[in-house]
């Protein structure tokens, strides 16, 4: 898979994913360390990359935009700060989430929990559950 690692995460996450055979770049690799969330979304969509972040604003942005790409993987727990742990969690989740991520999804990862939601997030889907 192709990943774009957001600034809140270490560049070592991209290195770990590349070591596992994935195409992964960190926003620093593009000189986007101060880029807006919109700019990061645009780059990820242009290159068919999954955004990997700890920035929960991406979930809100997806809901507001009502689009199916880019897909996003979010870390939601402070206990997962080590890059090695984050890489291991992504790799463990991919067998059950890869197809959805390719279609368009947001995946929220915690140490012992995974939540997956298909994109786009629309008002009607929100109201109907």
Where are these regions (language model features)?
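Charged phosphate-binding loop/patch that engages nucleotide di/tri-phosphates or the phosphate backbone
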Residues: 96-129
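N-terminal beta1-alpha1 ligand-phosphate binding loop
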Residues: 2-12
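Short helix-loop-beta junction
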Residues: 16-24
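Acidic, metal-binding active-site segment of PIN/NYN-like and related structure-specific nucleases
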Residues: 44-62
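Mid-chain, well-packed structural core segment of small domains
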Residues: 59-94
């Amino acid at each position: 898979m192709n990943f774009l690692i957001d600034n809140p995460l270490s560049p070592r996450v991209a290195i770990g994913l590349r070591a596992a055979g994935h195409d992964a770049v960190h926003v620093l690799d593009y000189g986007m360390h101060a880029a807006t969330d919109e700019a990061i979304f645009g780059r990820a969509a242009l290159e068919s990359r999954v955004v990997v972040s700890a920035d929960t604003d991406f979930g809100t942005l997806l809901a507001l935009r009502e689009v199916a790409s880019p897909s996003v993987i979010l870390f939601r727990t402070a206990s997962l700060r080590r890059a090695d742990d984050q890489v291991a969690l992504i790799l463990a989740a991919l067998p059950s989430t890869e197809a959805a991520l390719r279609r368009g999804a947001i995946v929220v990862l915690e140490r012992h929990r995974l939540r997956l939601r298909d994109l786009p997030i629309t008002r009607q889907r929100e109201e109907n559950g």
